[in-house]
Amino acid sequence: MKLKDIYAFCVKEGIKADLRTSKQIESRLQEKKKEYRKLPQGLRRYFDKESLKNPYSDTRILFGDPELDIKSVLIGIDIGVEEVLLADQLSKNGKKIDLVISHHPEGCAYAGLYDVMHLQADLLCNIGIDKDIAESFMKKRIGEVERKIHGANHEKVVDAARLLGVPLMSCHTPADNHAASFMQNLMEKEKPKKVEDILDILEGILGSRFANVTESLNRYGPRILL
């Protein structure tokens, strides 16, 4: 499977699992196209053209030839320079790693993380909140995240991957969409009445699927934080 096909598959499956309507997703893409058309010709080369067809700004091929054939992948929630080095060393020791995939974004995908948060406003609309109120509610939080990550060293991990020749991509919101869709379907099926009922449901799933870590669930399993 080629790198570009893995990337396209992630985006496609993310859209399929998105809790928003197809109309809402298309509307966000149209906003990006309108934004692009308004730019002076000289500035268009700086525009993230991938955002014209991919509604998830936190999911990108960060380094690597899109035509590269991929047979083995190292994937993790967080990928730092150390994991890129691990992939490089594994390849040198005979365990070839063709691609590293990070769930949490790096590079331009991290720099654009705030932009994908507009989907939260769409979801608020879907539960009956007025669009203007939803947009206003999210605007402050989106601005906070944008300012927080603006000065970050976005390219640190990507540069390490480039220097070592390790292909790298991130897949954030598409994966989160599947988690959200799973939870939505689960809650609709189980119909919990109290928050503690939700914990019981989640602990039951974790206990059955990860029996070897059941004793540790009280440390890092589901918890009520508020």
Where are these predicted regions, by residue range?
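Hydrophobic structural segments
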Residues: 1-226
